[in-house]
Amino acid sequence: MGSKGDNVAVCNMKLERLLSMKGGKGQDSYANNSQAQAMHARSMLHLLEETLENVHLNSSASPPPFTAVDLGCSSGANTVHIIDFIVKHISKRFDAAGIDPPEFTAFFSDLPSNDFNTLFQLLPPLVSNTCMEECLAADGNRSYFVAGVPGSFYRRLFPARTIDFFHSAFSLHWLSQVPESVTDRRSAAYNRGRVFIHGAGEKTTTAYKRQFQADLAEFLRARAAEVKRGGAMFLVCLGRTSVDPTDQGGAGLLFGTHFQDAWDDLVREGLVAAEKRDGFNIPVYAPSLQDFKEVVDANGSFAIDKLVVYKGGSPLVVNEPDDASEVGRAFASSCRSVAGVLVEAHIGEELSNKLFSRVESRATSHAKDVLVNLQFFHIVASLSFT
């Protein structure tokens, strides 16, 4: 049996030292469980293109490199595909304007705990000893210089006025920390009996909303210092259609149903103390459009070119939807790929395995409901800096 008391209390630990999608290339890794994110990203490429059209092009004789950043890049191939798309689109704009394209630089940024090694192994080789035009025309090669930048995007990461374009997808719903009041048993916001805020009390969800808005304010403040005049940002995060923050939409179904029930199973079986369960909270908040807009407006540095709720679809990729066991495995793997690192830090590897085994079993028993109802909505924001 795993230890009940010796593991890390995730709520009390700085998340940036710990939080990451599951690294490597195993069955439960993010690299092998991010196909749905890839499909959602592809469905939004037309919105990304619109944002890229708003970026100012430097037409000077010797322009500096065009610099793009993916914030919250994680460790799968999706970030590489997005950067490739950005570089090629901007290059086409230079060509259409009759301007020689500059060199391109891309920064992949995530928390220090991110598996950058797996990410860098996915990068195609850089075309060398040739001109930029030939680089951009080469298939299967990279036409931009790269670097990894570890650190929280809720703080400054780059020198002032050095970035042309920021991209961040499926990351801003992750909070910098679980609000302290949520894990304080003396607080009215204490999230007793739950590991997520879906269906929680008003004071609990208010604490999460305040944390999200404070984090987003810090994010915008940092980017406003780093982006060049005429630069832009394309941001995507989990969102919700309900005005009620206790209804967290797809995130609520992912973390507030079978995942929650699996924790309760461990408590009933005496494997985890109720207090230990209550000390674990998923640091995710799916905002409404109004939640998001209030922060952008208050910051005042960015013009909102587009701000919409976009239906992304299911986070699961299932080849045989009639196979309940495959649906259950996909659900459990999806949960584990994004939350497994936190769970294991909180209760240890052995109990973590037991937890996700129960998640899989419960999702298998409700496979049809999972396929029909587990749908994600995203907040999509196109912002420009002038």
Curated annotation (Swiss-Prot):
GO molecular function, one term: identical protein binding
Residues annotated to bind S-adenosyl-L-methionine: Y30, G72, C73, N78, F108, S109, D110, L111, S152, F153, Y154, A169, F170, S171
Organ and tissue specificity: Expressed in seedling roots and leaves. Expressed in the stigma, funiculus, and vascular bundles in sepals, petals and stamens.
UniProt keywords, alphabetically: Magnesium, Metal-binding, Methyltransferase, S-adenosyl-L-methionine, Transferase
Assigned EC number: 2.1.1.278
Residues bound to substrate: Y30, N33, S34, Q35, A36, Q37, F170, S171, L172, H173, W174, S334
Cofactor(s) this protein requires: Mg(2+)
Record bears the keyword Transcription: no
Top-level taxon of origin: Eukaryota
GO biological process, one term: polarity specification of adaxial/abaxial axis
Annotated Mg(2+) binding sites: N191, V195, R277, D278, F280, N281
Catalytic activity: (indol-3-yl)acetate + S-adenosyl-L-methionine = methyl (indol-3-yl)acetate + S-adenosyl-L-homocysteine
Enzyme class: transferase
Tagged with keyword Methyltransferase: yes
Free-text function comment from the UniProt entry: Catalyzes the methylation of the free carboxyl end of the plant hormone indole-3-acetic acid (IAA). Converts IAA to IAA methyl ester (MeIAA). Regulates IAA activities by IAA methylation. Methylation of IAA plays an important role in regulating plant development and auxin homeostasis. Required for correct leaf pattern formation. MeIAA seems to be an inactive form of IAA.
Family: Belongs to the methyltransferase superfamily. SABATH family.
Miscellaneous remark of the record: Plant silencing IAMT1 are smaller than the wild-type, show epinastic leaves and smaller siliques, and have low fertility.
Assembly notes: Homodimer.
Protein name: Indole-3-acetate O-methyltransferase 1
Organism: Arabidopsis thaliana
